[in-house]
């Protein structure tokens, strides 16, 4: 097992996006859905079990771990102090689980710095949501189009509209973090 694998994580208390790269090439995307679990310790157990399963099933030994850094300041219309503290607490728990399972000290990357490093420009005036712009960028970055899971909205004003599954955005963010982390490692060696 000589291949070097890197993992990227977009951690939140509801969905965790995970990307796996072999050397500097995309390998797979995963997610962990925690939306139906309220207790943080139960969430941590689910995360540990799922990441263990991924590592075992894929038969990989991870050399690098990159995690999207948490918000460090308030922005208008964004998260409250309570939300940021809860996310920071959970991020720490998950980071420790990742360290225990992989033996790798995580490298934290600011999402805006990661996007800048990759040349991702978000068009704030576009009719396309910024999260969908990230998915589109990932699709353009891949040699083959990724088969993103879709759903048909069943009610409300968007009834009948086909949209990405909610976890796709987290997987795309994890891809960006991992790819930027790998480039960062290469540039600094």
What does each model-identified segment do?
Residues 1-189:
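Phosphate- and other anionic-substrate recognition elements at nucleic-acid/protein interfaces
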């Amino acid at each position: 097992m000589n291949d070097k694998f890197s993992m990227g994580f977009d951690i939140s208390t509801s969905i965790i996006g995970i990307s796996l790269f072999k050397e500097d090439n995309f390998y797979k995307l995963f997610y962990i859905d925690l939306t139906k679990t309220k207790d943080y310790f139960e969430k941590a157990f689910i995360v540990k079990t799922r990441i263990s399963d991924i590592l075992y099933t894929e038969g990989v030994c991870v050399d690098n771990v990159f995690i999207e850094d948490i918000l460090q300041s308030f922005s208008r219309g964004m998260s409250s102090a309570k939300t940021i503290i809860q996310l920071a607490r959970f991020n720490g728990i998950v980071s420790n689980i990742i360290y225990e399972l992989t033996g790798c000290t995580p490298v934290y990357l600011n999402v805006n710095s990661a996007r800048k490093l990759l040349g991702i420009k978000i068009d704030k005036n576009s009719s396309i949501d910024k999260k969908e712009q990230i998915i589109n960028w990932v699709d353009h970055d891949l040699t083959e189009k990724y088969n993103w899971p879709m759903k048909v909205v069943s009610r409300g004003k968007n009834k009948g509209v086909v949209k990405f599954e909610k976890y796709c955005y987290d997987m795309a963010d994890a891809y960006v973090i991992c790819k930027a982390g790998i480039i960062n490692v290469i540039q600094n060696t």
